[in-house]
Amino acid sequence: MSASIVAPPPERSVAIAQARRELIHGEASRSRGSARVEPWILRSWERCMEAGCQPQQRITFEPVAKSAVRDVAERNRALVSAARPVIERLSRAIVDTRYFAVLTDADGIVVDVGPLPDGTDTASRYARNIARVGVDLSERAVGTSAISTALAEQESVWLHRGEHFFEDTSVYSCAGAPLFGPQGNCIGMLDLTGVQALERPELRHLATLSARSIENVLVMNEPCELRLHLSWPGCPGGEATEGLLCIDAGGTVSGANAAARQMLHQPLARSHAPQCNDLFALPLAMLFDAARRGDAVLEVPLWSGLRVQVRPQRGGKGSPGALPEARPRLRDVEAALIRKAVTDARGNVAEAARTLGISRATVYRKLWRGRASTDTPG
């Protein structure tokens, strides 16, 4: 494909130019041009101006010392290892578009790159300028970009040509998606960049999907005693939709992917790591036992009244020690049956009590005891 400069559609180009004149150059508003530019772009422009930057400033990409490259590689070994197979796959999807993949850490420092477009033309030179491990592509270094805005907003973005703050970076078009680690913290972002290329906003979807794949690999690599694969009943699970939870020997959630956080409506972060008991109305010992059987898929009630399908597995890579012995205690089984009856009765305790042939007071007492205690295997 030719690397000739391709402008965005006329309407969008005019809106971008008008927004730049109004916000960056202080021109009085004569239209609603700025309303056609995404709010997160305007916020980034404002941050650049507050930092004393001017659009016409020259942006240079200095050589990176070998020692700095080694330090970056060492610090991000786990991220790069998880991302590289994903980058190889997505690079096949964009091979004919003159776009390429860039992986950064949470500070916008390049930690890995995909294959670059062939050539010795100006576009290839621009690509090589940024596609080097150790290059700083943060907002403080290069202004508004998909990298800086994805990290600042922690949302996937698409950015084309004149939406970059600096004139020197207006040759780039890029899609970006943030990356979140198993504990829920932002650990970097995945960027798909083209130079003087056709506008491809659909790459935002590819970047987002690929970022979720990288996150899933990181969760699968997280040391744990038990790993839970979650899906909704009747909905086939897949890499893009399956929830993943890492559980330690004490029943604490030690890692999760984005799908699990959404399905369980929980942050599942290091600062808010719930017990398995807080999520599932089922004894943890039963999940460990199902993992030992190896092929069990359970339909598990949540405290919200919803149900999820859970496929428990023994802890994977890096898990210390063997899976502890786990046998459900009688009181745990009893409590689980009561929870199930309440869930089946859609929260109607009186109806659940009638079904079980026990008093409502007994139902309340058993539920409270099960909720307050922490179930551990063994």
Language-model features, listed with the residues they occupy:
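PAS-family sensory/regulatory modules and their coupling/dimerization elements
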Residues: 162-163, 171-176, 278-325
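N-terminal capping loop/helix in small sensory signaling domains highlighted by a polar->aromatic N-x2-3-F motif
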Residues: 114, 255-267
